[in-house]
Design a protein with these regions (language model features):
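A generic structural signal for short
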Residues: 7-9, 106-107, 194
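NAD(P)+-binding Rossmann beta1-loop-alpha1 motif at the extreme N-terminus of oxidoreductases
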Residues: 1-75, 97, 101, 138-141
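Generic alpha-helical secondary structure signal
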Residues: 42-46, 62-65, 85, 152-155, ...
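Rossmann-fold dinucleotide-binding core
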Residues: 87-91, 110-204
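Glycine- and other small-residue-rich loops at beta-strand/loop junctions that grip anionic moieties
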Residues: 12, 33, 79-80, 107-108, ...
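Rossmann-fold NAD(P) dinucleotide-binding segment
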Residues: 63-129
Length: 204
């Protein structure tokens, strides 16, 4: 990839890989990052790049500084890591490389109060933060998920997010800005509660 990427993804699990391919197929330049842990997660980004057909518009990294440098300003970075301490760890490691006006998007199932805490912390650095509930699982991430967004800086990434989602029966993108703070993750929490209740009813 010869020019700066329009978005970066951190975390190449099933959701991260599906969304990376989805974004690339919509014509965006993208950088992907996965940590390197000896004997646990080795060469994940490189292996993913070796399999993709989008090497001209996608770059793979296992070092955060080079990953961040590959992104066009203001940088837009989508986190797809496990909810909880892992998100805080990634943000702590990432922020030294960021500048005012950059945007972090948490695409995992974080608790909405954690999202609000992180947003407040990042506001002191003038870094925008979005909590984005992403529904559809690995298949949806690849073919078109539904996305529920809350926080600050949505306009910086709204066109991209709306381009990768599913569409409703009227052709409208299944991507909505819910509101400030942790609103996006709050709605995703309610969504998951309804889904799991329905699954329990079917099981019974």
């Amino acid at each position: 990839m010869n020019s700066h990427a329009q978005i970066g993804i951190i975390g190449l699990g099933a959701m991260g890989q599906g969304l990376a391919l989805n974004i690339a197929e919509k014509g965006y330049r993208i950088s992907v990052f996965n940590r390197h842990l000896d004997g646990v997660e080795e060469n994940v980004a490189q292996d993913f790049m070796a399999k993709t057909e989008h090497r001209e518009t996608m770059g793979g990294f296992d070092e955060l500084d080079s990953f961040v440098q590959s992104l066009a300003a203001p940088r837009k970075i989508l986190l797809l890591v496990s909810a909880g301490a892992a998100v805080d760890e990634v943000i702590e490691n990432l922020t030294p490389f960021l500048k005012a006006g950059d945007l972090i998007i948490d695409g995992g199932n974080s608790h909405y109060r954690d999202t609000e805490r992180r947003l407040q912390d990042l506001e002191t650095m003038n870094i925008d933060y979005l909590g984005a509930g992403i529904s559809g699982g690995p298949d949806g991430s690849r073919q078109g998920p539904a996305i529920m967004v809350g926080g600050t800086g949505y306009k910086k990434v709204s066109d991209l997010l709306c381009s990768i989602t599913a569409q409703d029966s009227s052709g409208k993108a299944c991507c909505s800005y819910i509101g400030a703070g942790g609103a996006g993750h709050y709605v995703k929490m309610v969504h998951n509660g309804i889904e799991y209740a329905e699954m329990q009813l079917l099981a019974e």
